[in-house]
Amino acid sequence: MRVAVLGAGAVGARIARQLLSGTSVTQIILRDTDADRLAQVSKSLGDRVIIEHAPFNSQLDAEVIVVATPSGTQMSTVLEAIEHRRPVISTSDSLAETVGILKFSKQAEENNTPVILGTGFAPGLTCVLASHGVAWFDKVEEIHISKVGTGGPSCALVHHRALSRISYDWRHDNWARRPGGSGRSLCWFPEPIGPQDCYRAALASPVLLHHAFPEVSWITARVSATLRDRLTAPLPMLSPPHSEGGLGAVRVEIH
């Protein structure tokens, strides 16, 4: 199988390495618009990878497309993949982008094109854990997601902006709108993370979980934040995020 990975950042580079660890993928096309980033990443990849310094939306010769460009830039590529009937995987954790892509679910179904959303940390791992937990119970009424940490610079930027935007919780057959940065909740994560104050934010997890579990009456998601995080959320980031993201954890609570 020939797979195209668009984006050679912290997430895209790791996706490429993970795909190389198996035998089902015969070739990977790793594409990015940043030549320096591609040169750095290519040093740790083998001869099954073709490095392309090209625009993301230009023609691709691949059976499956993995879109690992920064959140907020993925929608046009996903729609192009649907149009050309190519299976596509999106790593976006942007609420607006996730909702936008979901609007084309009917077109994807008509084109018989698989489109996979929520493939990161949260949403992604949290959705898998929620699905696993739901299977243990006869009936589930609540799912609550909490997250600490980011996967890289673009993920950190989404996290930063989300704290200043409207959050959406699913509650009793309606979407409840609440200000980002509100709703403090002390959440306990595995060590070495430990307890963290978590707050509402514009997160995609409730939307995807509602689509997966429409019978659940209350679905929420929160992210960890300090006082400075909440106060500076409407402003540009004051300091550059760590290139590798650092430690992180997720918590999935089911009732």
Label the predicted regions.
Residues 19:
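Aromatic pocket-lining residues of Rossmann-like dinucleotide-binding sites
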Residues 62-83, 95-97:
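Beta-loop-alpha module in the N-terminal Rossmann-like domain of NAD(P)-dependent dehydrogenases
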Residues 24-42:
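NAD(P)-binding Rossmann-fold cofactor-contacting core
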Residues 92-115:
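Rossmann-fold NAD(P)-binding glycine/threonine-rich loop
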Residues 3-7:
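Conserved N-terminal Rossmann-fold NAD(P)-binding element of oxidoreductases
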Residues 12-13, 74:
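N-terminal Rossmann-fold NAD(P) dinucleotide-binding loop
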Residues 135-255:
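C-terminal catalytic/substrate-binding lobe primarily of soluble NAD(P)-dependent oxidoreductases
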